[in-house]
Curated annotation (Swiss-Prot):
Organism (species): Sinorhizobium medicae (strain WSM419) (Ensifer medicae)
Transmembrane segments: none
Job of this protein: Provides the (R)-glutamate required for cell wall biosynthesis.
Top-level lineage group: Bacteria
Keywords: Cell shape, Cell wall biogenesis/degradation, Isomerase, Peptidoglycan synthesis
Similarity field: Belongs to the aspartate/glutamate racemases family.
Pfam families documented for this protein: Asp_Glu_race
Listed pathway(s): Cell wall biogenesis; peptidoglycan biosynthesis
Protein name, UniProt field: Glutamate racemase
GO biological process: cell wall organization; peptidoglycan biosynthetic process; regulation of cell shape
Gene this chain is encoded by: murI
Length: 271
């Protein structure tokens, strides 16, 4: 199989947070082209009614798979994958889906205090999937679920170069910090792919040091394990396409995409 015959990897997110996963995946799969898809017409996912969001994502993937025929799809969105991942695998059994789920298992393995917080969207927090992960892997820990209504939007704005106020960020992360019987939270799981972009702000404003757990590298490693590596490949150069379901990303977003080696594709609205 020559490099021109290699199918691309599709990376999907509700917005631009999935760029954290794309960045890691490119390091591990330099022989592949990537297609980045941002469902900005539906962003943010956290406030959607579950049935409507499930219907939207399944229909959207029907169009994406038909048009792009990727090798695999990486769902770089906790809210989407915890809701619709199983359904995507049933509806499109010919496709491999690699999902993003809260990194509760590694957090439970690493914590010393036994106090772990999961910083997510409201949608991810209320999923049975998330609670099943806690029951399976962190039953001996005190796990606090923090569903932020605002942080994904704030992170998108920050990535685009807009300023955030310390007080606004501090209010969003404050519930993550718990003290019980002289012990303190020592790990916060970043259960939204937007949040790692703001992790340095979190570190600066945290009331005490914690380990902010970013799952992007683990997701990329999982994807790499499922993608065949051809013999004699050469790393690819050039821009990959970025697709926005609104069909109209603003100038700041286009500039950001360029910084990630992506070129916004000229497509009509998909959403």
């Amino acid at each position: 199989m020559t490099k021109t015959e290699l199918k691309p990897i599709l990376v999907f997110d509700s917005g631009i947070g999935g760029l954290t996963v794309l960045r890691e995946a490119r390091v591990l799969m330099p022989e592949r082209h990537f297609i980045y898809v941002a469902d900005d017409a539906g962003f943010p996912y956290g406030g959607w009614e579950e049935g409507a969001l499930k219907e939207r994502v399944i229909a959207l993937f029907g169009r994406l798979l038909a048009e792009h025929d990727p090798e695999i799809c990486i769902i770089a969105c906790n809210t989407a994958f915890t809701l619709v991942g199983a359904d995507l695998r049933i509806v499109y059994p010919q496709m491999t889906f690699v999902g993003t789920v809260p990194a509760i298992k590694p957090a439970a393995e690493r914590t010393r205090s036994g106090l772990v917080s999961v910083l997510a969207t409201p949608g991810t927090v209320k999923r049975a999937y998330t609670r099943d992960l806690i029951q399976s892997f962190a039953s001996q820990c005190h796990v606090r679920l923090v569903g932020s209504e605002n942080l994904a939007r704030m992170a998108e704005a920050y990535i685009r170069g807009e300023a955030l106020t310390d007080d606004a960020v501090r209010a969003e992360i404050a519930p993550c910090f718990v003290e019980v019987d002289g012990k303190r939270t020592d790990i916060v799981v970043l259960a939204c792919t937007h949040y790692p972009f703001v992790a340095n702000v979190f570190r600066r404003l945290a009331p005490w040091p914690v380990d902010w757990l970013d799952p992007a590298e683990a997701i990329a490693r999982r994807a790499r394990s499922l993608v065949p590596l051809p013999n004699g490949f050469e790393p690819l150069n050039g821009e990959d396409p970025a697709i926005f379901t609104s069909g109209k990303p603003d100038f700041a977003t286009r500039r950001l995409m360029q910084g990630f080696g992506l070129k916004v594709a000229a497509v009509g609205s998909l959403g």
